[in-house]
Amino acid sequence: FEELRNNDFQENLPLGPIGRESEFYAFWCKYLSGEKNLTLKAFKGGMFSDRFAWVFLSGYQSAIQHTFSEMSSDHWASFAVSEDRRGTLPGLDWSKTEKGILLNGYKTWVAAVDQMNTIIVKAGRGDRAVYLAVDRDHSNLTLTRKEQGFLPEMSEGVAHFQDAVVSEKDLLSDKNVKQFGKIEILYIYLAFCGLVASKSKDTTVVDNSWAIAEEISALVHSEDFFALKEVDVKVQQLRDEAGGNMLGVSGWDADQKLIAMYSKGIQSRGD
């Protein structure tokens, strides 16, 4: 982070607003896909952002690549876990066939459905659960747009697998999956710090954002939940301090809830 700050980090910042997901994806592919350091990747993504949808997606992509290191880093993926537990859409299950792994069922929340190249899914439950990476163009996968949710610029969708056969080579390791919830928050917080570092008019707030990012980067490989609680307090304070002095951030008042919403769960958990 020190090297990034000492260099002219504003050199590649967008010259104007990026209002469409496809535009931010193209920008991300050009300037960030080759970044191997996932903490810097999330932070830089936040610096390039001008709204919270891009902050979320920047952190989300680093979290996915952290969790599933087998995944390519040069395009977007979506980790689809949610299912219709109370409705009529059956959840995703699998069976083994001579041709490979047969998938049938639905995933009800796919982030960045318009841009993602790969959908990562959990199929089955309990001891039967497996994780697979499926190309968005699979002939037996249907992706349907749904009404946009909590971040208006981010596309969302539903995935329907109907007799979709995938190779066992598409199986992913689940060794880091249990940590995804925590990891996702940390990378999104990093992206938020990047947003504040590049958009705040207050030099003290900017300094704080860089310092907090350093702290967060040290936690992505740590299991110290108390430290996460401490850094969450600092991130929420940063959010309060940054409000009112941000330049060119679309939807700040409405969408800062993205950062606020994680805090209650973090602070209510035991150490």
Name each model-derived stretch:
Residues 104-137:
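DPxDG-like acidic metal-binding loop motif
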Residues 89-91, 128-131, 156:
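Short, mixed charged/polar active-site loops
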Residues 111-113, 142-143, 168-170:
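Short helix/loop capping segments that flank catalytic or ligand/cofactor-binding pockets
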Residues 1-115:
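Glycine-rich flavin
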Residues 139-165, 174:
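Flexible, small-/acidic-enriched active-site or ligand-binding loops
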Residues 1-42, 105, 186-271:
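Alpha-helical interface subdomain recognition
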Residues 160-190, 200-207:
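A glycine-rich, basic-preceded beta-loop-alpha segment at the flavin cofactor/substrate interface
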Residues 64, 161, 196:
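Alpha-helical metal-binding/catalytic segments enriched in His/Glu/Asp
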